[in-house]
UniProtKB/Swiss-Prot annotation:
GO biological process terms, semicolon-separated: response to pheromone triggering conjugation with cellular fusion
Residue stretch(es) of the prosequence: 204-224
Family: Belongs to the SRP1/TIP1 family.
Function summary: MATalpha-specific protein that interferes with a-factor, the pheromone secreted by MATa cells. Contributes to mating efficiency. Acts to bind and sequester a-factor rather than to degrade it, and promotes the efficient mating of MATalpha cells by keeping the a-factor concentration at the plasma membrane within the narrow range needed for accurate pheromone gradient detection.
Membrane topology, record value: Lipid-anchor; GPI-anchor
Glycosylation sites: 148, 181, 191
Name of the protein: A-factor barrier protein 1
Entry annotated with the keyword Lipoprotein: yes
Signal peptide: 1-25
Keyword Disulfide bond in annotation: no
Post-translational modification: The GPI-anchor is attached to the protein in the endoplasmic reticulum and serves to target the protein to the cell surface. There, the glucosamine-inositol phospholipid moiety is cleaved off and the GPI-modified mannoprotein is covalently attached via its lipidless GPI glycan remnant to the 1,6-beta-glucan of the outer cell wall layer.
Natural source organism: Saccharomyces cerevisiae (strain ATCC 204508 / S288c) (Baker's yeast)
Subcellular location: Secreted, Cell wall; Membrane
Lipid-carrying residues in chain (GPI-anchor amidated asparagine): 203
């Protein structure tokens, strides 16, 4: 009986400590989630001009992309391909920047696009200096860059074209399905192993073949 009050007190202290710890952990997780959401939004905001420049370039210079990938054994990251599957299903009025912030594979795309020798040229056309990743904004290392006037001007210019670009990004690529010369060139340039992988890729993408950006489909045929 002498130790009963002490044991009860210790139990209560431990219970209170557990509740405090649990509450703190929940707040930490919520804070971390909010930080990640804000960081992804900031990265999408900063990279939007480059994304638009890339989509336009990829549409018009498709043969150059596929040729370079074949010669250098580059592959299209699956998360990037998955995002384009998703993108072409977006409504023409969709907010592409918001969608990119939610689900775009920033890191995988950076790895892919920086492998091309004309990456710097695309940056210059977009008036950008690099591709920003969400983690850059979590660390705060880009804060000074994001406040300059050239960035603000770039942001306003891009935001006005986003809804239009959302629809055109997919539709312009789909129109490439009619370019038989490009398809023939890709098939003839592939070896027997590539041809086998092409067949597998076509079967896997059959359900969405009418909607998948044909430029990216061509890259799958060559690279996977």
């Amino acid at each position: 009986m002498i130790f009963a009050p002490s044991f009860s007190l210790i139990k209560n202290i431990l219970l209170v400590s557990f509740l405090i710890s649990h509450s703190f952990a929940a707040k930490t997780l919520t804070s971390s989630s909010n930080d990640d959401t804000l960081a992804r939004s900031a990265a999408a905001d900063a990279d939007m001009a480059f994304f638009m420049e890339f989509l336009n370039d990829f549409d018009t210079a498709f043969p150059q992309y596929t040729s370079y990938m074949m010669q250098n054994h580059l592959t299209l990251p699956q998360p990037v391909a998955d995002y384009y599957y998703h993108m072409v299903d977006l409504a023409s009025t969709a907010d592409l920047q918001s969608d990119i912030a939610q689900s775009f594979p920033f890191t995988q795309f950076q790895t892919f696009i920086t492998a091309f020798p004309w990456y710097t040229s695309l940056l210059n056309k977009a008036s950008a200096t690099t591709i920003y990743l969400p983690q850059h904004f979590i660390t705060g290392e880009t804060e000074a860059t994001m406040t300059n006037s050239s960035y603000a001007s770039q942001k306003n210019s891009v935001s006005n074209s986003v809804p239009f670009s959302t629809a055109n990004a997919g539709q312009s690529m789909i129109s490439m399905a009619n370019e038989e010369n490009s398809t023939t060139a890709l098939i003839s340039a592939s070896n027997s192993s590539s041809t086998s992988r092409t067949s597998q890729s076509q079967n896997g993408a059959h359900a969405k073949s009418l909607y998948f950006p044909m430029a990216l489909f061509g890259i799958f045929a060559v690279a996977l």
